[in-house]
Amino acid sequence: MTYISRTMLWQRYLGTRISSTILPVAVRRIHYGGGRLQDPRYVFSKPPTNDPNQSKEGRDGKHFFTPSVNDGTENSTLHNNSRLSESEMSSIANAIAEQKRKRLKRSIITIFSAFVTAVLGYTIGYKVWYLKEQSFIPLYPCSRVRKLSTRDLRRVSVKKIEDISEVRVLERLSQHKMIQEEYGVPLRDSNGKAPHVSDFSVWCEDQDPCVTGLVFEPDSNRQSSHSWYRIPYVFKWRITHRPISISSFIDDVLNWINVSTSDLFEVISPEKVYGSFKYEYPIQGDNHSLHICFLGEMKLDENTTVIYKGKYHVDVKLERIDLLRTENKKLVRYILFKEEDEK
């Protein structure tokens, strides 16, 4: 019989007590269910199944908070119940589109405000206040044809143009064979007197494209023929029309880089600007190509009227003369003179 001391018995007793206390904490027990071992990945959750009607507690962990879609079958009942209606989807889409439109509108307003601020700051703040110079802001293109301004009327005599054009028209009519045969020479109207102009109009035509814009100047007491809108002690402004000279713009760009047009080419073409008046002097004060055009009407009798058109630059230059006459209750036009026919 083996002798066991009290010390060994005491050690065995303590070891048994300690192991019985520690092992339940450190060792995981494996439970058996249905004859199969439980998957250790789903100790704290239930494994997924292929049953579409299973509860949420038995679903796949990847779709715990969202409905799953079965492969090869229609969407689950929960998924169908959670689908948004067409009206709700349309409302969401409209809200997103409205938000985008508001954002785009804010961006456009910001860019436009920055552009206007920069233009006004340079035009008024720098050129008018600092440099004390005149500045011009173009707004929109305008027609090349315009009425004579008050300043133009002081430099051009409309009565003189009317009288000279009347003489030139009578000269042309007296040389025409149709007028000589049907009305005779010297030409007389129904009252037996020399025909006179009954209606006459004058206007300007710029050769260069024109724009309408705002002119700014420092506010001063200097007299001017123009009507100004004023902000006292700040600046004054008015609306005006100005031509855009492409050749002058090119000259300015070349001068900025210390190159002149004479270094590149030299073209002399007075016919382009002054036509047949290349040996005449232009009107003083004009810094761009400007034509003064006129249209006149002269009656020969109750059924016959002469209409003529031309340009004025120191002298009158006729472009066209038409005769309008009523024949068999119809208005017939005869072209008596046309400038292109003589070239």
Swiss-Prot record:
UniProt region (Disordered), positions on chain: 41-84
Positions with biased composition (Basic and acidic residues): 54-63
Positions of transmembrane segments: 108-130
Membrane-related topology note: Single-pass membrane protein
Signal peptide from the UniProt entry: none
Keywords: Membrane, Mitochondrion, Transit peptide, Transmembrane, Transmembrane helix
Transit peptide: 1-29
GO CC terms: mitochondrial membrane
Predominant localisation class: mitochondrion
Keyword set includes Transmembrane: yes
Location(s) in or outside the cell: Mitochondrion membrane
Bias (Polar residues) ranges: 67-84
UniProt key word ATP-binding: no
Family membership noted in the UniProt record: Belongs to the AIM39 family.
Protein name stated in the entry: Altered inheritance of mitochondria protein 39, mitochondrial
Taxonomic classification: Eukaryota, Fungi, Dikarya, Ascomycota, Saccharomycotina
Name of the coding gene: AIM39
